[in-house]
């Protein structure tokens, strides 16, 4: 189904004017939404549990409260805490403080679509989902443009939910570059599939498999790292800028010919069938329930997966090589933890 890109001129109603806005969570998306909205003249407070994020929000000049206090004070509440903690946070601290006519927003449809969170019928539920990480949402805003966003309405109690969603997207800078209307179902299922089958799960598995094929055939791990991981950014940047066409115009004829001949040998019809199975587990709620169950059990699976990933040879080789390549960027773990 074709969709129409919308821009600032299409945001007809200043639905957030005069509203007290509470951003719940001050992590990757939270700090960006809050700062951008404040810079566009909105009345923003922060609701977050005590800790680094609480301290960072105060340092950045926000009136900062507990989640319950912020929810009680606000007309519009945007929940930007991690997906897995949102249900407990909502039930314990937000739901008891909601009033008829309030609006509750999300940047991802996970908890609403899979019904971990159920909002009263007299409260609006909307979405503003910028298609980029929080630091990029903030940086591009400061540069005078923004990151494209999806917006959606799940529940329109007041008749104003769409206006609130669009005005929120305008406030964070996304309407400068383009908005696409979607649904909670579509955003949630497509986002999870993209992460799992292509952007995160599929990509890292492909890189790891390529590295293992080369090293198992006797090639030097350091050279294998450059061939299958380091150069990935160069190719992805070309695709990002101009699609497959620009990438293929920019590489050698040898590489282009190999692309056409060998790509389908790697990504076969069986791989597509595996992707369909991944999508099915997303659609039927299996993935969501497994993820939440693991969180409630203390994250044993996620912890084990992280330990396994940290011990991969490609990670160890890459860590050593990057020490000699300061141009690839500094890994500031402390800042990353504050904003995640």
Curated annotation (Swiss-Prot):
Positions that bind Mg(2+) 1: 191, 195
Residues annotated for Mg(2+) 2 binding in this entry: 191, 227, 231
Pfam families: KARI_C (PF01450), KARI_N (PF07991)
Pathways involved: Amino-acid biosynthesis; L-isoleucine biosynthesis; L-isoleucine from 2-oxobutanoate: step 2/4; Amino-acid biosynthesis; L-valine biosynthesis; L-valine from pyruvate: step 2/4
Enzyme kind, highest EC tier: oxidoreductase
GO molecular function: ketol-acid reductoisomerase activity; magnesium ion binding; NADP binding
InterPro entries, A to Z: 6-PGluconate_DH-like_C_sf, KARI, KARI_C, KARI_N, KARI_prok, NAD(P)-bd_dom_sf
Obligatory cofactor(s): Mg(2+)
Residues that bind substrate: 252
Any GO BP annotation: L-valine biosynthetic process
Active site: 108
Domain KARI C-terminal knotted stretches: 183-328
Keywords: Amino-acid biosynthesis, Branched-chain amino acid biosynthesis, Magnesium, Metal-binding, NADP, Oxidoreductase
Any one Gene Ontology cellular component term annotated for this protein: cytosol
Residues covered by the KARI N-terminal Rossmann domain: 5-182
Catalyzed reactions: (2R)-2,3-dihydroxy-3-methylbutanoate + NADP(+) = (2S)-2-acetolactate + NADPH + H(+); (2R,3R)-2,3-dihydroxy-3-methylpentanoate + NADP(+) = (S)-2-ethyl-2-hydroxy-3-oxobutanoate + NADPH + H(+)
Gene3D superfamilies according to UniProt: 6.10.240.10, NAD(P)-binding Rossmann-like Domain
Chain sites annotated for binding NADP(+): 26-29, 49, 53, 83-86, 134
EC number: 1.1.1.86
Cofactor: binding comment: Binds 2 magnesium ions per subunit.
Family membership noted in the UniProt record: Belongs to the ketol-acid reductoisomerase family.
Task of the protein: Involved in the biosynthesis of branched-chain amino acids (BCAA). Catalyzes an alkyl-migration followed by a ketol-acid reduction of (S)-2-acetolactate (S2AL) to yield (R)-2,3-dihydroxy-isovalerate. In the isomerase reaction, S2AL is rearranged via a Mg-dependent methyl migration to produce 3-hydroxy-3-methyl-2-ketobutyrate (HMKB). In the reductase reaction, this 2-ketoacid undergoes a metal-dependent reduction by NADPH to yield (R)-2,3-dihydroxy-isovalerate.
PANTHER family: KETOL-ACID REDUCTOISOMERASE, MITOCHONDRIAL
Name this protein carries in UniProt: Ketol-acid reductoisomerase (NADP(+))
Organism: Streptococcus sanguinis (strain SK36)
Lineage of the species this protein comes from: Bacteria, Bacillati, Bacillota, Bacilli, Lactobacillales
Designated gene of the protein: ilvC
């Amino acid at each position: 189904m074709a969709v129409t890109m919308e821009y600032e001129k299409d945001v007809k109603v200043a639905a957030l004017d005069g509203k007290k806005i509470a951003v719940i969570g001050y992590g990757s998306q939270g700090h960006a939404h809050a700062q951008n909205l404040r810079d566009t003249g909105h009345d923003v407070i922060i609701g977050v549990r005590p800790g680094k994020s609480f301290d960072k929000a105060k340092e950045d000049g926000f009136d900062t409260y507990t989640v319950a206090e912020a929810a009680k004070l606000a007309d519009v509440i945007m929940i930007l805490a991690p997906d897995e903690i949102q249900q407990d946070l909502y039930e314990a601290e937000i739901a008891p403080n909601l009033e008829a006519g309030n609006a509750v927003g999300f940047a991802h449809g996970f908890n609403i679509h899979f019904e971990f969170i159920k909002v009263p019928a007299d409260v609006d539920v909307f979405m503003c989902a910028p298609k980029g990480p929080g630091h990029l949402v903030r940086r591009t805003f400061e540069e005078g443009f923004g990151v494209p966003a999806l917006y959606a309405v799940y529940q329109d109690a007041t008749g104003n939910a769409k206006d609130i969603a669009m005005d929120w997207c305008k406030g964070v800078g996304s309407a400068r570059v383009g908005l696409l209307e979607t649904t909670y179902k579509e955003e949630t299922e497509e986002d999870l599939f993209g992460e799992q089958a292509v952007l995160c799960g599929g990509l890292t598995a492909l890189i790891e498999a390529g590295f293992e094929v080369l090293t198992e055939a006797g090639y030097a791990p350091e050279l294998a790292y450059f061939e299958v991981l380091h150069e990935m950014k160069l190719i992805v940047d070309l695709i990002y800028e101009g699609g497959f066409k620009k990438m293929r115009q920019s590489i050698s004829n040898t590489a282009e010919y190999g692309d056409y001949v060998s790509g389908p040998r790697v990504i076969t019809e069986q791989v597509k069938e595996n992707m369909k199975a991944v999508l099915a587990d997303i659609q039927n709620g299996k993935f969501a329930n497994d993820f939440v169950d693991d969180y409630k059990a203390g994250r044993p699976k996620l912890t084990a997966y992280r330990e396994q990933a940290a011990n991969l040879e490609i990670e160890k080789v890459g860590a050593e090589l990057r020490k000699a390549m300061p141009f690839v960027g500094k890994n500031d773990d402390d800042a990353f933890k504050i904003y995640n």
